[in-house]
């Protein structure tokens, strides 16, 4: 492998502890029409300067962000406190907070872009596909101590990609139609250049070379333009997991964050023990992403390089049992146990379809149900 110039080396800040942080994207919907509202700038201005609320690509979106947290419970409490303030302001202006991977019936062409140079450049380059990004998700950061661990952890974590996507899948509808997918968001987002599945590098120098080549050829200007579903965040000293569709309620989010935290810490500890982490061929990883997006919790996923297969919910049962000691050490055993409730009672995409069926296909009722799930 070719080395990179010293100026292209990437410092990884490193985290002395396996801390966790969460970014949760919300759409604003009109309280009466349930369509999207492009009033995020007004809401953010009223909230005032804070590191906990950010703007996003579209003016219908606000992002709520935690600080650096020790465990899932602390992260959920952080989000809860911020959301109470945000929702009060949103409701005072005749809107509600809504979260799912997509809005059931909103049309992308009527949405306004946030005024920022980086967003303007994104749309200038990506054109029609960039304008289609009417999607919302959740990002989870987990602290990693050293750069040499990052790429092996990311490459191995891809084995659990379908589990995370199937559990969070919440985007069956697009522009008023049922797509037949559990997560249409996952299929949409990968259309952007530099988005989608990460390359399965095994060393930090490989990643440095990739970033160097991307910049030299004009594909990116800044490292944050690498929009992988799982990516390093060198300045934070974390691995950032961006697999999830938008999550509509804080209890479900807590379970997904706990699962993510446990998975990353488990891999980190196995590296410390001298274990070579398991990886699958990229063609299996790619197929698993598609199966989870298409079939959600009914997906039969590929388990390993030997092409063994299993229903994702059956594999989740064993995975949750295996992770229990890790969860206890991270003080998130209760939240991890909640993962099973998602697939026993139905993921968001299943709940949305059930509501639509009960209301003769009325997608306004689906928005109502999702808004109501955000109990604070």
From Swiss-Prot:
InterPro entries: GCL_type2/YbdK_subfam (IPR050141), GCS2 (IPR006336), Gln_synth/guanido_kin_cat_dom (IPR014746), YbdK (IPR011793). It is an enzyme of class 6 (ligase). The keyword Magnesium does not apply. Belongs to the glutamate--cysteine ligase type 2 family. YbdK subfamily. SUPFAM superfamilies: Glutamine synthetase/guanido kinase. The keyword Nucleotide-binding applies. This is Putative glutamate--cysteine ligase 2-1. One of its GO terms (biological process) is modified amino acid biosynthetic process. Keywords: ATP-binding, Ligase, Nucleotide-binding. Its EC number is 6.3.2.2. ATP-dependent carboxylate-amine ligase which exhibits weak glutamate--cysteine ligase activity. Gene3D superfamilies: 3.30.590.20.
């Amino acid at each position: 492998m070719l080395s990179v110039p010293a100026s292209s080396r990437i410092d990884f800040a490193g985290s002395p502890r396996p801390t966790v942080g969460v970014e949760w994207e919300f759409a604003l919907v009109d309280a009466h029409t349930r369509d999207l509202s492009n009033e995020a700038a007004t809401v953010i201005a009223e909230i005032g300067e804070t590191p906990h609320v950010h703007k996003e690509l579209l003016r219908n979106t606000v992002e709520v962000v935690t600080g650096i947290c020790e465990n899932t419970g602390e992260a959920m409490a952080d989000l809860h406190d911020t959301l109470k303030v945000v929702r009060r302001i949103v409701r005072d202006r005749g809107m509600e907070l809504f979260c799912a991977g997509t809005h059931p019936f909103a049309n992308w062409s009527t949405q306004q872009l946030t005024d920022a140079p980086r967003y303007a450049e994104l749309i200038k380059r990506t054109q029609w596909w960039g304008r289609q990004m009417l999607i919302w998700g959740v990002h989870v950061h987990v602290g990693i101590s050293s750069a040499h661990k990052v790429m092996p952890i990311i490459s191995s974590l891809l084995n659990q990609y379908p589990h995370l996507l199937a559990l969070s899948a919440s985007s069956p509808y697009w522009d008023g139609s049922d797509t037949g997918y559990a997560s249409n968001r996952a299929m949409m987002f990968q259309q952007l250049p530099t988005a989608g599945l990460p390359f399965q590098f095994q060393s930090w120098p490989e990643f440095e070379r990739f970033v160097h080549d991307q910049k030299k050829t004009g594909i990116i200007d800044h490292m944050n333009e690498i929009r992988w579903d799982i990516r390093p965040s060198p300045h934070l000293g974390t691995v950032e997991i961006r697999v999830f569709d938008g999550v509509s309620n804080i209890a479900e989010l807590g379970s997904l964050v706990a699962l993510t935290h446990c998975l990353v810490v488990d891999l980190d500890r196995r590296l410390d023990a001298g274990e070579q982490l398991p990886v699958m061929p990229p063609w299996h990883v790619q197929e698993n992403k598609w199966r989870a997006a298409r079939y959600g919790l009914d997906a039969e996923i590929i388990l390993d390089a030997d092409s063994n297969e299993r229903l994702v919910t059956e594999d989740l049962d064993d995975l949750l049992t295996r992770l229990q000691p890790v969860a206890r050490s991270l003080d998130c055993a209760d939240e991890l146990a909640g993962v099973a409730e998602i697939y026993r009672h139905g993921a968001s995409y299943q709940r949305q379809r059930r509501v639509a069926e009960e209301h003769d296909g009325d997608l306004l009722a689906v928005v109502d149900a999702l808004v109501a799930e955000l109990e604070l």
